[in-house]
């Protein structure tokens, strides 16, 4: 199926996110929703760690249009509900996290799993099945080490999270693991574009681009 409207590529630092992508172990083409840098202020300097691209299954566009068509980019960017609809919507999402600085798998997965577990426990929804999903998540990342230009790839399906690793800008044909856990699938993308998401730049890009797509749909 052709995209309802054309979307453009996005350059983040020296990394280019193409307008469409086919994730590992998939035959479907996903549209680039938005992309941006993740960084932190350290000692008065903004240190950039990763470039993050958020891709959406094309079925997301008509689904989102019912509620959000006609809204401005600013309205979407300021709406917690808009990003929640992307996170929890009944369509697949694909997140590409490309390293700007080197990182070990344990450093990455440790922080993500710590945040997920704390969030679930605070909400009173943590279960033994979630604990097993986190264990598997940590195991998948444990032997990994990432250099600048390498990518961590997540396919967010409604009931599962598929994890892949790409080296030097390549998108692999196969995935490394599938974790059957709805909450983990949503939590990983929420960590990027949720209310406390780590990449305000990716959120702004997503709101701007999706507003344009919906208003031409």
UniProtKB/Swiss-Prot annotation:
rRNA processing keyword on record: no
GO terms assigned for molecular function: chalcone isomerase activity
Gene Ontology biological process: flavonoid biosynthetic process
Domain of life: Eukaryota
Reported tissue expression: Petals.
EC code: 5.5.1.6
Gene3D superfamilies per the UniProt record, alphabetical: 1.10.890.20, 3.50.70.10
Positions marked as site (Important for catalytic activity): 108
Pathway: Secondary metabolite biosynthesis; flavonoid biosynthesis
Record field: catalytic activity: a chalcone = a flavanone
Keywords linked to the UniProt accession: Flavonoid biosynthesis, Isomerase
InterPro entries: CFI, Chalcone_isomerase, Chalcone_isomerase_3-sand, Chalcone_isomerase_bundle_sf, Chalcone_isomerase_sf
Pfam family of the protein (one): Chalcone
Annotated residues for binding of substrate: 50, 115, 191
Function: Catalyzes the intramolecular cyclization of bicyclic chalcones into tricyclic (S)-flavanones. Responsible for the isomerization of 4,2',4',6'-tetrahydroxychalcone (also termed chalcone) into naringenin.
Family: Belongs to the chalcone isomerase family.
Note: Part of the biosynthetic pathway for all classes of flavonoids, a large class of secondary plant metabolites, many of which are brightly colored.
Name this polypeptide is given: Chalcone--flavanone isomerase
Species annotation: Eustoma exaltatum subsp. russellianum (Bluebells)
């Amino acid at each position: 199926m052709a995209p309802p409207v054309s979307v453009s590529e996005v350059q983040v630092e020296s990394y280019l996110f193409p307008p469409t992508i086919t994730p590992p172990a998939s035959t479907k083409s996903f549209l680039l929703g938005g992309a941006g840098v993740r960084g932190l202020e350290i000692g008065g300097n903004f240190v950039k760690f990763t470039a993050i691209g958020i891709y959406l299954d094309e079925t997301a566009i008509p689904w989102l249009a019912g509620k959000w068509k006609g809204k401005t980019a600013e309205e979407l960017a300021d709406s917690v509900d808009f990003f929640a609809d992307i996170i929890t919507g009944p369509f697949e999402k694909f997140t590409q996290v490309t390293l700007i600085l080197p990182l070990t798998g344990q450093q990455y997965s440790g922080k993500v799993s710590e945040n997920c577990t704390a969030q679930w426990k605070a909400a009173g929804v943590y279960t033994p099945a979630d604990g097993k999903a986190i264990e598997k998540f940590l195991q998948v990342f444990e032997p990994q080490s990432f250099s600048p230009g390498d990518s961590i790839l997540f396919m967010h399906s409604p009931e599962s999270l598929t994890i892949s690793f790409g080296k030097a800008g390549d998108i692999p044909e196969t995935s490394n693991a599938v974790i059957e856990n709805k909450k983990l699938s949503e939590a990983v993308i929420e960590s990027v574009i949720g209310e406390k998401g780590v990449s305000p730049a990716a959120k702004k890009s997503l709101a701007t681009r999706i507003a344009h797509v919906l208003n031409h749909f």
